[in-house]
A protein has these predicted regions:
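Conserved beta-strand element within WD40/beta-propeller blades
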Residues: 101-105, 148-153, 195-203, 242-245, ...
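Short coil/turn segments within WD40 beta-propeller repeats
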Residues: 107-111, 154-158, 201-209, 248-251, ...
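Intrinsically disordered, low-complexity acidic/Ser/Thr/Pro-rich linker and tail segments
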Residues: 2-111, 199-200
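Solenoidal tandem-repeat scaffolds enriched in leucines and small polar residues
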Residues: 179-187, 193-261
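Per-blade loop-tip surfaces of WD-repeat and WD-like beta-propellers in eukaryotic adaptors/scaffolds
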Residues: 64-73, 112-122, 160-179, 204-220, ...
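Loop/turn segments within WD40 beta-propeller blades
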Residues: 91-98, 136-145, 185-192, 232-239, ...
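Blade-level signature of beta-propeller repeat domains, shared across WD40, Kelch, NHL, RCC1
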Residues: 356-388
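WD40/WD-repeat beta-propeller blade N-cap
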Residues: 77-87, 125-132, 173-181, 223-228, ...
Length: 388
């Protein structure tokens, strides 16, 4: 395996001092008591102006919009399986303050890119024997390190990487014996980290979901009759839930108590399989290939909200921007901004050549909040910023 590094070292980011607001409020309160009436009236008028400005800011926030910033790379590749299975790239801020973008090339290499300093870090050539369709990052708090796993579809292997020197720490061969592995994720229990892999019933063998320790040994298997395209974990209070995306529905499994937890979604069989899944604040948001978004109560399974845009396009990757706004990668080569509260399509963003597989949000110093999108096949990875 050849690892090719960029010789330039990324610049260190400047530390930002945080202002102690509570001390300022205390000082201001004491000074107000010493003011005469006219001075207090002036302060009150300033407060009214500030409140008016705050209302304007809220109004601006409701008119959320984005602008194309730049193409990060034109060398990325996302296999057709990727958009409905996992994350075709990952972005994260590492412990050593590098803003990583990790993606795959058509040559089955893993590419590492520093977003903040706009430079390539390294390339791992021939990282897998087949197209890489899923990346996951995890911060190991116990050992204070960043971990990365990559999943390839038909070489059936999972690899765990050290991102600081780009060596393969662990290779799990034949993680799924049916010949296709679509998705894998990290599972953390009592500060111990495990790798959990999806199954696939292409050959109708009904392989179980497998959980491996970081030595590659299987510690647990969970049997499912469904073929799993997407897998992830959701943590709430003292419970760990495994989130499973299938062609027909979304399933949650209570890992802590070893039992099935819930079923979500009612359109999988008639409107296309589920392609994007997020769990946030006890709500599960799922999009499907038929252009429908369902928002469900995670614990009861009840559908709280439904947005049908099947006349526009099919949906792939989803990204929750804030409590009210969702970004969705679509089959019509756009990213759509949807207001969940109003159930309305607010904006469409153009520029990709093919289906948009994955959309993710990140904060980058000097740029601010932004999102990154990737199209399937040999498309670009694009960076978008908030319009001010």
């Amino acid at each position: 395996m050849n690892v090719k590094y960029n010789s330039e070292k990324p610049k260190k980011s400047k530390k930002i001092k945080l202002f102690n607001l509570s001390n300022e409020q205390l000082t201001r309160h004491k000074s107000l008591n010493k003011m005469n009436n006219s001075e207090k009236e002036n302060i009150n008028s300033i407060n009214i102006q500030n409140n008016t400005q705050n209302e304007k800011n809220k109004l601006k926030q409701s008119d959320l919009d984005f602008a194309f910033y730049k193409d990060l790379t034109s060398k990325s590749y996302a296999d057709d399986f990727s958009g409905s299975c996992g994350y075709t790239f990952t972005i994260f801020r590492s412990i050593n303050e590098i803003f990583y973008l990790i993606f795959a090339s058509i040559e089955k290499s893993i590419m590492s890119y520093d977003i903040k300093n706009n430079q390539k870090i390294c390339e791992i050539k021939n990282a897998h024997n087949n197209y890489i369709i899923d990346f996951r990052h995890f911060y190991d708090k116990k050992n204070k390190r960043d971990l990365l796993i990559s999943v390839s579809s038909f070489d059936n292997n999972i690899k765990l990487w050290n991102i600081y020197n780009w060596t393969c720490i662990l290779e799990i061969k034949n993680a799924n014996r049916t010949g296709a592995l679509y998705s894998a994720s990290f599972l953390c229990e009592n500060n111990e980290i495990y790798i959990i892999s999806s199954n696939s019933n292409l050959l109708k063998r009904k392989d179980p979901i497998k959980i491996f320790n970081l030595n590659g040994a299987i510690i647990k298997q969970i049997k499912f009759s469904n073929s799993i395209d997407f897998i992830d974990c959701y943590y709430e209070i003292n419970n760990i839930y495994i989130i499973l995306g299938t062609h027909n529905n979304v399933i949650s499994y209570d890992y802590t108590n070893n039992k099935m937890y819930n079923n979500y979604g009612k359109y999988g069989q008639t409107k296309g399989h589920y392609t994007g899944i997020i769990v946030h604040n006890s709500k599960l948001i799922a999009s499907n290939f038929g252009g429908i978004i369902e928002i469900c109560d995670f614990h009861t399974g009840e559908v709280l909200n439904e947005i049908n845009m099947s006349i526009c396009s099919g949906f792939l990757g989803v990204c929750l921007w804030d409590e009210n706004n969702l970004l969705v990668g679509c089959t019509d080569r756009t990213i759509k901004l949807i207001n969940l509260k109003e159930k309305k399509l607010k904006k469409c963003f153009y520029g990709h050549k093919y289906f948009v597989a994955t959309v993710k949000k990140i904060y980058i110093p000097k740029i601010g909040d932004c999102f990154i999108s990737q199209g399937m096949t040999s498309d670009t990875i694009k960076l978008w910023t908030v319009k001010k």
